[in-house]
Design a protein with these regions (language model features):
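Positively charged n-region of N-terminal signal peptides that target proteins for export
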Residues: 1-4
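Aromatic-flanked redox-active Cys/Sec active sites in thiol-based oxidoreductases
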Residues: 70-76
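Short, internal strand/loop/helix patches
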Residues: 117-150
Length: 180
C-alpha cells in the first residue's frame, strides 16, 4: 500500500511541477502582415472618442523596441490567464523594451470590457477596442464575417514589421514578449 501511495504521489508531483510545460503556440504570419502592419484606425477603450491608429502604434515604438498587441475578449478564459501574466510582469516587460497594447475583439459593451480589465488590474494599460473586427480582418487574422480564435498576440518591431504571431500563451510567453 505504501508503494502504491508513493507511486501515486510521485506521479502527481511529476505532472504538476511543469515537467511537461507547454511552449507558446507560434503561428505562421498571414500574408496581410508579413511585411508590415497595414494602416488601421480603432478606438481607445478609456474613451470611445479617442482614435488609435497605426501612427499611435508607431509613436509607441519611439519609446520601446517592440510592441505586443495582445488580443482578448471577456469570455476567453485563456485570454484572462495571459493578461494576468502580463500584468504581473508588466514592469519587467517594459524594462526589456516591449510596450503592451491590449486589443479587445468583437465586443460592443465597452463598460463590460473596462470592468473586466479593472478586475485584472489591467485598466491602466493601453487598451483599444475592435468591436466590428475590422482590425483583425485587415491584418488577415480572420476572413470577413468569421470569428477570431483567441488568444492571439502580434509582436512588432520599431518599423512595425511583425516579428511573431502567437496563439495560446505558454510558459515562455513572457520571455517571448521580452524579446528573449
Amino acid at each position: 500500500m505504501k508503494k502504491l501511495f508513493f507511486a501515486l504521489f510521485a506521479f502527481v508531483t511529476f505532472f504538476s511541477t511543469g515537467a511537461f510545460a507547454a511552449d507558446s503556440q507560434k503561428l505562421p504570419l498571414p500574408t496581410a502582415i508579413k511585411d508590415s502592419l497595414p494602416w488601421f484606425a480603432v478606438r481607445e477603450l478609456k474613451d470611445d472618442n479617442t482614435p488609435f491608429t497605426r501612427g499611435h502604434l508607431a509613436r509607441l515604438t519611439q519609446k520601446y523596441d517592440r510592441v505586443a498587441m495582445v488580443y482578448f475578449a471577456t469570455w476567453c478564459i485563456p485570454c484572462r490567464a495571459g493578461i494576468k501574466q502580463v500584468v504581473a510582469q508588466q514592469a519587467e516587460i517594459e524594462k526589456a523594451g516591449t510596450a503592451i497594447v491590449l486589443v479587445n475583439v468583437g465586443e460592443r459593451e465597452t463598460t463590460k470590457v473596462r470592468d473586466f480589465l479593472a478586475k485584472l488590474s489591467a485598466d491602466k494599460m493601453v487598451s483599444i477596442t475592435d468591436p466590428y473586427g475590422r482590425l483583425t480582418e485587415g491584418f488577415g487574422l480572420v476572413k470577413e464575417g468569421q470569428n477570431i480564435s483567441l488568444p492571439r498576440t502580434i509582436i512588432v518591431n520599431k518599423s512595425l514589421k511583425v516579428l511573431q504571431l502567437i496563439g495560446e500563451e505558454g510558459d515562455d510567453y513572457i520571455k517571448i514578449l521580452m524579446g528573449q
